[in-house]
Amino acid sequence: LHDAHPHNRPDQMAIHPVVRVHPETGKKALYVNEHFTRRLVEMNSTESDVLLGYLTKWVANPRFTVRYRWTEGTIAIWDNRCTQHFVLNDFVGERIIQRVTIMGDKPQGNKPAWKPWIRPGRLSATSRHDRQLYMYLKSKKLIDVD
């Protein structure tokens, strides 16, 4: 469950694959972000938290990174479909950053092997993220309502 807004609004949420297939190269890439990816829908909240913690640390591993030496007039462009931006504040001087985001394709991946995790019953003890997932799936009519 990818949540671009912290106030549990279904219109600001989306479900997308954790591993997406790049539409032009066909290569696979992890598509998780520590700021927006809330949980893995095929797992309960506890399992999801553990795996997401691992994956968000994995994508920041230095062996997968590119360091860029900024000079005056430098322009950097990257493809967010297969890369992530991570700032190290190890520079001096002023930088002016202008971000341009192009609306892209809907992330595609392989067909999921599991179905979304649904709490065992309406009155079951669940985490906030489990309830958030349940409400999202219910609003999109992706599950049968109790």
Enumerate the predicted regions with their spans.
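Active-site environment of non-heme Fe oxygenases that use a 2-His-1-carboxylate facial triad
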Residues: L1-T65, I75-I77, R81-D146
